Amino acid sequence: MMLDSFRGKLLIAKPNVMRDPHFAKSVVYIYEQTDKVCVGLVLNKPSYMNVGDIQTMRGVHNSGANGHLYRGGPVSEQSLMLLHTDDWYSTNTIQATHGNAISSDELMLEKMEHNNMPKCWRLMSGMSTWLVPQLQAEIYKHKAWLVVEPNQEIFYNFDEEDQWQAGINLASSRLMDQLF
């Protein structure tokens, strides 16, 4: 069986199909895939906390960095992940796709304390994971997700439902490009 590559793709929750509250009206960036597992971050679900709250909780001086803490997914919700442009790195940074990288260490918060930050970023708690067959079933059998190649703007220029709507529009545009 051929392995679908979802790495670097966006999953856009289809309206009226995705009923899981973690993923309804969500935009998920799949940044890593093995032959068994896909790992991604929900991009458009801010929590009630902000970056300053997290810095204070972790004993790091509040840098004044503005921004929500986003819910990256229901797995490892105590873990912090920084999705950011690849113009910056920390001790545990991995290159992703589309000019993005992912960092996940305490040093990233300390760097932010000293205004050493990437051009664009989102701080996430948790991540989203699927077994590859599970994700394939959600996409092809249950038709719960639109799968689309992202553009750079969608990662950082929208928020909440606006980001989901931008994802729907991007998927529609890409489909129209294929048809005409």
Label each region the model flagged.
Residues 1-180:
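A short aromatic-anchored loop/beta-hairpin motif
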